[in-house]
Amino acid sequence: MATRPTDMVNTMQDAAVTCGPIPGSHKRYLGGVRFPELRIPLREIRQSDSRKRDGSLEVNPAIPVYDCSGPYTDPDVVIDIHAGLPAMRWQWSPTDTAIESRPEPGSAYGRARLADVRTADLRFHHRREIRRAANGGNVSQMHYARRGIITPEMEFVAIRENQGLEHLRASHPALFRAHRGESFGAQIPDTITPEFVRDEIARGRAIIPANINHPELEPMIIGRNFLVKINANIGNSAVTSSIAEEVEKMVWSIRWGADTVMDLSTGRHIHETREWIIRNSPVPIGTVPIYQALEKVDGKAEDLTWDLFRDTLIEQAEQGVDYFTIHAGVLLRYIPLTANRLTGIVSRGGSIMAKWCLAHHQESFLYTHFEEICEIMKAYDVSFSLGDGLRPGSLADANDEAQFAELHTLGELTRIAWKHDVQVMIEGPGHVPMQLIKANMEEELQHCFEAPFYTLGPLTTDIAPGYDHITSAIGAAQIGWYGTAMLCYVTPKEHLGLPDKNDVREGAITYKIAAHAADLAKGHPGAQVRDNALSKARFEFRWEDQFHLGLDPEKAREYHDETLPQEGAKAAHFCSMCGPHFCSMKISQDLQEYAQSKGEDIETARLEGLQEKAEDFKRLGKNIYLR
């Protein structure tokens, strides 16, 4: 049954979101240098001390890690989703005074929703002023970067990318032990500086999605010379979910590591749902504006118009959406190229625009009005996520002519956007077998001029409905290694239904694994610190530290306690897998202690131990079996 507005009101009145620190961690903030007012968040994972053989203690340092959970994991912050998060960015030193404020929405639809008494109880009531560039100006991060200006957002992300690891390099060099990576041409410095960030944005190799109407945002950067990021999709549909559920899904997503969130709502009250999400989101929010535009014409793609779509862009930009997926590369002449595909056009946005092109037998208004779209984007600093409307929906269709024809057009559109100093990233597939994945990255780098690549997986096999978070994470780790800057998560419900909270968590953790594996393979400085800390804790049977250093401390503890729930088991030198007598790490520890007691290296001690056992065999009568 459809949810009535009164039901939605009650839901929001009683709404609550997940708050509180992640187990074993505490929030820490770093300050800016150029902009001292900055407070850059990170999470520190506390560790217990190690007890040496002589009884003395070795202090293990807290491990700082990148954190995108916002104030929701800070116990010192009082969360009120009805008030929203603080407008932090509006308190920073202004980069440009050429910004005007508007008391009322500039979009016709925004004004209509504001005047509609039927939606009054659904609205987010603490309205922010609406800002935009004055006199046709440009407030994009790329515009400032190309003028040689370092913005507060640029310093923020530079400090954030370094993860506060600098102090550990001198004090605990063993934590930085790592294998040499293969970056496939990426140029990752040992330390990220604000100037490096500025240069990468000016070149178009990275973006900071940060709409000036999203002051609650904690800025982040997307680019192949930075940490690989992940995106989580949320959103209601015509049959499921409420505003409160979507706000909680956003908070839940970022708790488990989502760097950005896309609101793909297609149900009722899209405008109001999005406002609640943005006002409470510390991460960039992306949308696919054509979805809402389609709802405005009752789902009839052929009735879409440029004027309607333009108004939708302004409506969403004024709310604070940080990036738009726009399928402007679906051209009329490319549609016949999909005729022989096994699965045709699987992108929802791509199929909408293909239907419009065929109905009118002309190029899409997204393509013909692209420069006008750029004018809107630069006035609010909304980034493009140029959509892959012709992405393959099955292995059989991977890397075909339609897919790459659209990709080349996205490269053409990238250059047009850059002419207007508008930030761009490129969306990618999809369903691709492992041996064809690298070609996707190479094509994108060549034809889209190193603009950041943002891929959905890709899924590496089509035989596992219910497990597509795994089939896609295989491809995601691989393409992330090759240079993809952001990975769009896939949940176990992919192809089957809308994800719930558990699916969101599963998808986010799975993709954090893929992104981190890619960072390790690329040789990202400091990427292996957390791995090394956890491995040391594992070898020393520091169970609590193992739980806390993992991506999902709660699940790690739950699995351990299924078989060894006693509190004393947290100090045991074995787990239920091998038991007390067959633990390889316990045997290795014993060997190390034996060597230390003899004052020898491990190999010498091993040989001596073998010789001692041989002498015992002879002394006891050389019998194979003792009676």
From Swiss-Prot:
GO CC annotation: cytosol
Protein's gene: thiC
Name of this chain's protein: Phosphomethylpyrimidine synthase
Gene3D superfamilies in the cross-refs: 6.10.250.620, Radical SAM ThiC family, central domain (3.20.20.540)
Cofactor(s) listed in the protein's UniProt record: [4Fe-4S] cluster
Positions with a binding annotation for Zn(2+): 431, 495
PANTHER family xrefs: PHOSPHOMETHYLPYRIMIDINE SYNTHASE, CHLOROPLASTIC, THIAMINE BIOSYNTHESIS PROTEIN THIC
Keywords, sorted A to Z: 4Fe-4S, Iron, Iron-sulfur, Lyase, Metal-binding, S-adenosyl-L-methionine, Thiamine biosynthesis, Zinc
Signal peptide: none
Catalytic activity: 5-amino-1-(5-phospho-beta-D-ribosyl)imidazole + S-adenosyl-L-methionine = 4-amino-2-methyl-5-(phosphooxymethyl)pyrimidine + CO + 5'-deoxyadenosine + formate + L-methionine + 3 H(+)
Transmembrane regions: none
Pathway(s) of this molecule: Cofactor biosynthesis; thiamine diphosphate biosynthesis
Domain of life: Bacteria
Cofactor note: Binds 1 [4Fe-4S] cluster per subunit. The cluster is coordinated with 3 cysteines and an exchangeable S-adenosyl-L-methionine.
Presence of keyword Nucleotidyltransferase: no
